[in-house]
A protein has these predicted regions:
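Transmembrane helical cores of multi-pass secondary ion antiporters/exchangers
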Residues: 1-410
């Protein structure tokens, strides 16, 4: 007779084994993103009677925030070169902060109108959770094509910061919806400034303390453990202080990935930390996409209607992204550094959705006693539809688009 903990551990071992097998098959057979196959396999196997229910995994919406998000965000921030980031800070900030807010309004407004649910917190919540981008596969194409470094920094930097902005906006809207206190623009702006500013200061502070410790060590395994502790500790402490854990992790990751990498880490330590977090990134991404497949089984009876809503969501996602990208790019070229016009098409089409929207979808709470309970199944299916379309349609056509525009060497 298995104990509950043995049963849960066995389930996760099986899921990780499945993730590895699916990833190997996807690499050998096709160039489609392995995450798509993981989701489809997760959805497919969930209908077999021997496959455990999603609830048996011990999975809960809080697990996503406190276990999955910190290392995923830290890994992205650790690899970001601060000097290059600062060179393009204004376009990155414009795309990532006002851009995400405008995209949330446009996407939410469109799906509220076309999807027939009206304009309110539900469509805005969806607009916020689908706004963060995840250009991992696009950046791989950039490396293969030897694309301009400045273009890579623009795309990667925007993704890093719009992940943070999207999560903060999502959290503010979710609390307004669940708490029932209503929504005001002024209050939301103040809350945004408070949680972002507080998260940044806290992340910088704990990151600096970690740097001081790392500078006195020369043990790569211990230093790697400190980086992992920093990712989770910064997130947990920020959330306990009611500021943004996402911003805190990004700030700490940027500090350690630049200042710490240069002044406190040996080459062996850097290699250890990079390899470790890349492995964690793969494992957590794999689990996320299998879990969304298992989660969709819970709502298999509503899979017919929401696909109509998903079509509206995909259109809204693309329209919102297009308006923000082309408008902001045009304005920035008028008042600042001139960048090639062809880049705006890459920035628009390269805004793939991936692990962060999936994590936010899975973070939607159950049994809130609000209107969210009625719309959660629809949001899950529509969100999955957006991510699926993004990874398949956009991810597989990036290389031909770059070839057509004469960017890089493809």
């Amino acid at each position: 007779m298995q104990s509950p903990i043995e049963h849960t551990v066995g389930i996760y071992i099986g899921l990780l084994l499945l993730a590895c097998i699916v990833s190997i098959i996807s690499k050998l057979i096709t160039r489609l993103p392995y995450t798509i196959f993981l989701t489809l396999v997760g959805l497919g196997i969930s209908f077999f009677p021997f496959v455990p229910d999603i609830k048996e995994t011990g999975f809960g919406h809080e697990l996503i925030f406190f276990v999955f998000l910190p290392p995923l965000l830290f890994q992205g921030a650790f690899h970001m070169e601060l000097n290059r980031l600062l060179k393009h800070i204004w376009p990155i900030v414009c795309f990532a902060i006002p851009g995400v807010v405008v995209s949330t309004l446009l996407t939410g407004g469109f799906i509220g109108l076309v999807g027939g649910i009206g304009f309110g917190l539900i469509p805005l919540l969806f607009g916020a959770l689908i706004s963060p981008t995840d250009p991992v596969s696009v950046l791989a194409i950039f490396r293969e094509a030897n694309a301009p470094e400045d273009l890579r920094i623009l795309v990667e930097g925007e993704s890093l910061f719009n992940d943070a902005t999207g999560v903060v906006v999502f959290t503010i809207l979710l609390h307004a919806l669940i708490d029932g206190g209503g929504f005001s623009i002024g209050g939301s702006v103040l809350a945004f400034i408070k949680v972002c500013g507080g998260g940044f200061l806290l992340g910088a502070a704990v990151g600096w303390m970690a740097f001081l410790i790392l500078r006195r060590l020369n043990e790569h395994l211990l230093e790697n453990a400190i980086c992992l502790l920093l990712a989770y500790g910064a997130f947990w402490l920020a959330e306990m202080m009611h500021v943004s854990g996402v911003i805190a992790v990004v700030a700490a990751g940027l500090l350690i990935g630049n200042h710490g990498r240069r002044l406190a880490m040996s080459h062996k330590t850097i290699e250890t930390v990079e390899t470790f977090f890349e492995s964690i990134d793969f494992l957590l991404n794999s689990l996320l996409f299998i879990l969304i497949g298992l989660e969709l089984r819970e709502y298999s009876e509503v899979l017919v209607f929401p696909w109509q809503f998903a079509a509206a969501a995909i259109a809204g996602m693309l329209i919102g992204r297009a308006i923000v990208t082309y408008t902001f790019y045009w304005a920035l070229n008028k008042i600042g550094t001139k960048r090639p016009k062809s880049w705006k098409h890459i920035i628009f089409w390269g805004g793939l959705r991936g692990s962060i929207p999936i994590a936010l979808l899975l973070h939607l709470p159950l049994n809130t006693g609000t209107v969210l309970d009625n719309y959660r199944p629809i949001l899950l299916v529509a969100g999955f539809g957006c991510v699926f379309f993004s990874l398949v349609a956009q991810g597989t056509t990036m290389a031909p688009l770059m070839r057509r525009l004469g960017i890089g060497r493809i």
